[in-house]
A protein has these predicted regions:
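Anion (oxyanion) recognition and catalysis
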Residues: 91, 143, 169-173
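Glycine-rich beta-alpha loop elements in corrinoid/cobalamin-binding modules
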Residues: 1-34
């Protein structure tokens, strides 16, 4: 047994199941089409469990198994060299990237790197008003992509109601599809 729930509730399965340890390629049990090319995230958003679970530095998995769903935590924050490494691995294996599942950081997104291989939706976060100019820049880059393929996770509950609604409406006006994500305590 593993995952974020076990990380925050370490003793929940005591006496019932084995927890902890390492289980390489565990994502395959959940989704046989999924893979990770890196773990961790240096951004350290206050509401995110990734830095606590996986660290605030990236662990690059050089020889990751190429599969159609890429679940990395923050693809566009990876070094340019490693992003290019991921893209070249997909090209060499001729496996289509159907879903860059975890998404891209709007502040560091470079469409040119990923447009060559991403066949699925584009996912971004719009966590607070400060992200506005960066999300708008990304939406302009992707203006020719259908609305349904521009998915923006809009965090709510972290700013006043009016600010949260403003961000939702901005995503719509910029041609994106808002996915509202309520902020939750990490131990909830």
């Amino acid at each position: 047994v593993g995952g974020p729930a076990i990380f925050t509730h370490k003793n929940y399965f005591d006496g019932v199941a084995k927890t902890g340890g390492s289980y390489p390629d565990a994502v395959k049990k959940h989704n046989p089409m999924a893979t990770f090319a890196s773990r961790g995230c240096p951004v350290g958003c206050w509401f995110c469990i990734v830095p606590a679970m996986e660290g605030r530095t990236f662990t690059e998995i050089e020889n990751f198994i190429v599969r159609p769903v890429l679940c990395d935590n923050n693809l566009s924050a990876l070094s340019s060299d490693y992003q290019n490494h991921i893209v070249s691995r997909y090209k060499k294996t001729d496996v289509p990237l159907l879903d860059a599942n975890s998404g891209f950081e709007p502040r560091t997104f470079d469409e040119e790197v990923w447009e060559k291989i991403n066949k699925g939706p584009w996912r971004f976060a719009y966590d607070d008003q400060g992200d506005g100019p960066h999300v708008e820049r990304v939406m302009k880059m992707l203006k020719n992509v259908p609305r349904s393929k521009k998915r923006v996770y809009v965090l709510i509950g972290n700013e006043p109601f009016e600010s949260c609604m403003d961000r939702i409406y901005r995503v719509i006006s910029w041609g994106g599809e808002p996915y509202v994500q309520p902020v939750m305590k990490l131990n909830a």
